[in-house]
UniProtKB/Swiss-Prot annotation:
GO BP terms: regulation of ubiquinone biosynthetic process; ubiquinone biosynthetic process
Protein name per the record: Probable protein kinase UbiB
Gene: ubiB
Record family assignment: Belongs to the ABC1 family. UbiB subfamily.
Tagged with keyword Transmembrane helix: yes
Coiled-coil region(s): none
Enzyme Commission code: 2.7.-.-
Length: 503
């Protein structure tokens, strides 16, 4: 009955942080809404805004609910702006777990003692979070490494909270007036995937390797090497990186780092990942970024990445170019063409809504305009028009806000549009014209080479199938005609019989 005990804790938290009223307001009306309003409320925190109380409640419920709040903060298409801003303040910081447990977990996962695995292993962790903690070590071959190890016995705790979230999401969808639009079950399912992805450190290792290949020999970004012989789903061993935290501006200046160049690098790295690679680091907050002595960024923590299809890239390029040209009609038609907008949406209404939220953003010098804010405004419009926002674009918006904030912290005069526009124009130009046609033909050639030899047979089979379908349809039609005829004959026979009997 552990789940019942946990449910009691959650309900008690709702009381303590006065959230029953918030639930009632979301429900709209009805007897359950009235019942919630009648529930006793704690006298504490009564002067705090609802968004603040929700953040404090999630913090008190522990790491899994904190992470859930962080995920919600990236969904301005689902929750109001003030809630998104407040939930973004949630911090995933917990005390480290016992070093003995850490050693046991590593030895169990890698099948050898710590002494055989590492020449040196620092017992005191250098970083700790709700999912894992990190130790510094040295391999017998001499390389300095960082060893990330999952918290022991974490999965049962996560599954218990997730099952309660799924249970709650089902009731939210049934009872709340806004339940279906909020898509609570989809949000919890997305969070479930996000959490389980973070729990698989082999996936993180693969993400690091992919990003490393994409930026091999780059003069802008360093990605640590992965030591796969010392990795499992529970343990990750990567190259140790020395650098200055990107948030330590004073030290960066003292070290002679070119902050203007560094800010430009950040924007260029981001748009290179998006439009060249379609694969981007989606957790680029200052805590995951160091700066090397040679003015390059060092990326850390590869648990969350995003991938983009050519369709996603086209959506982004069209929308950004249209936004900065104030072509709101094109923004509206791009959304309708994407198929993410309900079929009955009128382009004129969507255009007017986009103009209303974006004109205030663009009524300032272009160098001061926030790309992330533009996307956020777009997501706010999406809430009103029931636009289906793709998870990868939400991740992208969150990452873009981080990159912008970081860039302007390094260089307040950073002009993102100046750096981004060449990427957008180059990518759009690359999608049309003879070169693009030739590239697409080359990419599709292997598929056509397989299809063409079997094409006559497939066409013949299709014709036969159509002919057989026509014969089946004709047979069914004939049977129906005969059934109708039989029915009429039966009716006539009954009528004649009745006439004879009445005589």
């Amino acid at each position: 009955m552990k789940w019942l005990k946990r449910l009691t804790v959650i309900v008690g938290t709702f009381y303590r942080y006065r959230l029953a009223g918030l639930c009632a307001s979301l429900m709209g009306s009805g007897w359950i809404c009235a019942l919630l309003k009648m529930m006793p409320q704690s006298s504490k925190l009564k002067n705090e805004p609802p968004a603040v109380r929700l953040r404090l409640a999630l913090e008190s419920l522990g790491p899994i609910f904190i992470k859930f709040g962080q995920v919600l903060s990236t969904r301005p298409d689902l929750i109001p702006h003030d809630y998104a801003v407040e939930l973004a303040k949630l911090q995933d910081k917990v005390p480290p777990f016992d070093a003995r447990l850490s050693r046991e977990q590593i030895e169990k996962s890698l099948g050898q003692s710590i002494e055989k695995l590492y020449a040196e292993f620092e017992t005191e962790p250098i970083a700790s979070a709700s999912i894992a903690q990190v130790h510094k070590a040295r391999l017998h071959s001499g390389e300095q490494v960082a060893v990330k190890v999952l918290r022991p016995n974490l999965l049962p705790v996560i599954e218990q909270d997730l099952s309660l979230m799924r249970f709650g999401a089902g009731w939210v969808e049934r009872l709340f007036a806004d339940g279906k639009r909020l898509k609570p079950r989809e949000v919890v399912a997305e969070f479930d995937k996000y959490l389980h992805d973070e729990l698989d450190l082999m996936r993180e290792a693969a993400n690091a390797s992919q990003l490393g290949r994409n930026f091999q020999n780059s003069d802008m970004l360093i990605v640590p090497k992965v030591f796969y012989d010392y990795c499992t789903s529970d343990v990750l061993t990567i190259e140790w990186m020395d650098g200055t935290p990107v948030s330590d501006i004073a030290k960066l200046k003292a070290d002679g780092i070119d902050l203007h160049k560094l800010a430009d690098y950040g924007v260029e790295i981001f748009f290179t990942q998006v439009f060249r690679d379609g694969f981007f680091h989606a957790d680029m907050h200052p805590g995951n970024i160091l700066v090397a002595a040679d003015n390059r960024y060092i990326a850390l923590d590869f648990g969350i990445v995003g991938t983009l299809t050519d369709y996603d890239k086209r959506y982004l390029a069209i929308n950004f170019l249209a936004f900065f040209n104030r072509d709101y009609r094109r923004v509206a038609t791009a959304h309708i063409e994407s198929g993410w907008v309900p079929a009955d949406t009128r382009a004129e209404e969507l255009e007017a809504a986009v103009r209303a939220v974006c004109e205030p953003v663009f009524n300032k010098p272009i160098s001061q305009i926030s790309f992330g804010l533009v996307l956020m405004r777009l997501f706010e419009v999406s809430r009103r028009f029931n636009v289906e926002i793709q998870p990868q674009l939400v991740l992208l918006q969150k990452t873009l806000l981080n990159i912008e904030g970081l860039g302007r912290q390094l260089d307040p005069d950073l002009d993102l549009w100046k750096t981004a526009k060449p990427f957008l124009v180059k990518w759009m130009n690359g999608q049309v014209g003879p070169k693009a046609l030739w590239r697409n033909l080359k990419n599709e050639a292997p598929d056509w080479a397989q299809i063409i030899p079997s094409l006559p047979r497939k066409i013949s089979a299709l014709i036969d199938e159509n002919r057989q379908q026509e014969m089946r349809d004709a047979y069914i039609h004939l049977v129906k005609v005969q059934q109708r005829q039989s029915l009429w004959l039966a009716v006539i026979a009954v009528v004649l019989l009745l006439i004879l009997l009445l005589k």
